[in-house]
């Protein structure tokens, strides 16, 4: 995996491009918001490229049954790897330029809304929001937003101290 400092760009929820220079921290989180493992890569590395190594590291450290991911991870290699590890992949469908599939997903959402049910994707989003909260807490409360060191090793060390403090804090919250 690339570890050089570079520029990462993605589209936000409103369709605008957002760019940043540096690195990207990929975190695998258990229930309760406890980080299991983390990988620091170049900012331009797509999340799906890190999913397989991250899942293998996590499966070596803890035993779990489900791999819950969003539609960015909807590729056959990740589904296959998840099954090989003995997990059940719960990955949202990404229609990717398939108009028929996109229309079918829209119709399903409409039917669920009319009946008063939530779609499976909406329910899984609530589970995935745990990871988003961990990322937000790492940035806001544990020094992940402003990193004043240079180099992969130093940035990784800085962020791992934040992960360590976050893990200890989450475990104290669960105990008390």
PLM features: residue spans?
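Catalytic-loop motifs flanking and including active-site residues across diverse enzymes
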Residues: 50, 130, 134, 160
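Residue-level detector of flexible, active-site-proximal loop/helix-junction positions
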Residues: 42, 96-97, 153
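Helix-centered, glycine/charged polyanion-binding patches within enzymatic domains
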Residues: 71-141, 148
């Amino acid at each position: 995996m690339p570890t050089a400092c570079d520029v990462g760009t993605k589209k936000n929820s409103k369709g605008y491009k957002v760019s940043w220079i540096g690195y990207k921290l990929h975190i695998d989180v258990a229930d309760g918001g406890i980080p299991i493992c983390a990988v620091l890569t170049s900012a331009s590395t797509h999340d799906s490229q890190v999913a397989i190594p991250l899942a293998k590291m996590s499966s070596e450290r803890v035993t779990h049954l489900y791999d819950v991911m969003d539609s960015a991870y909807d590729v056959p290699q990740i589904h296959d790897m998840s099954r090989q590890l003995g997990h059940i992949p719960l990955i949202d469908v990404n229609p990717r330029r398939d108009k028929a599939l996109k229309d079918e997903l829209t119709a399903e959402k409409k039917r669920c809304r009319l009946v008063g049910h939530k779609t499976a994707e909406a329910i899984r989003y609530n589970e995935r929001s745990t990871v988003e909260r961990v990322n937000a807490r790492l940035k806001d409360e544990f020094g992940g937003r402003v990193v004043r060191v240079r180099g992969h090793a130093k940035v990784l060390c800085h962020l791992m101290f934040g992960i360590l403090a976050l893990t200890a804090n989450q475990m104290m919250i669960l105990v008390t």
